[in-house]
Amino acid sequence: MQIDISTQLPCSLAEVIAQVRTPRLLHQVASPLLSFSPLTPVEFPGTWSEGTYWVKLKLFGVLPIGRQAIVITYPQMENAQTFMLRDNGYSPLITKWDHVITAQEVSGGTLYRDRVTIEAGILTPFVWLFARQFYAHRQRRWAALAANGFSY
């Protein structure tokens, strides 16, 4: 199942790129619905490099819901005014969590888009329902952070 949601952010493409590359931003936009704790490597880097990061997930910061692989790549874009980050993640229960973030410079700011493909067997509809709410929450948090100059 797929999710495709976008929002226009009141900031430059360069600001979005700088922020989306940081685990710190992930914590900000996911909170308080999900929290991520690094397993392997044992600490998050200052910025995401291409590679696999295993994390422990907690719902509302307290309820353990398992572990997840965050698999970061930065696909090349033909258009210099568009940025892409891909997390082709998975977990023991979710066989596919393919999250593609694109950011594109538009008049008045940056168009930010989350596209997610989820496969989790018979759990897929339930995981999709949660993910739909989660990504809407993330985009609201993104918009609030961008409006405040990313001071967090």
Predicted region positions:
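Short, surface-exposed coil-to-beta transition loops
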Residues: 2-4, 65-71, 95-100
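Solvent-exposed residues in well-ordered beta-strands and their adjoining turns
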Residues: 8-12, 56-60, 104-106, 117-119
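Hydrophobic pocket/interface hotspot
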Residues: 16-20, 26, 85, 103, ...
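Beta-strand/loop substructures that line and gate deep hydrophobic ligand-binding cavities in soluble
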Residues: 82-132
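Charged phosphate-binding loop/patch that engages nucleotide di/tri-phosphates or the phosphate backbone
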Residues: 140-152
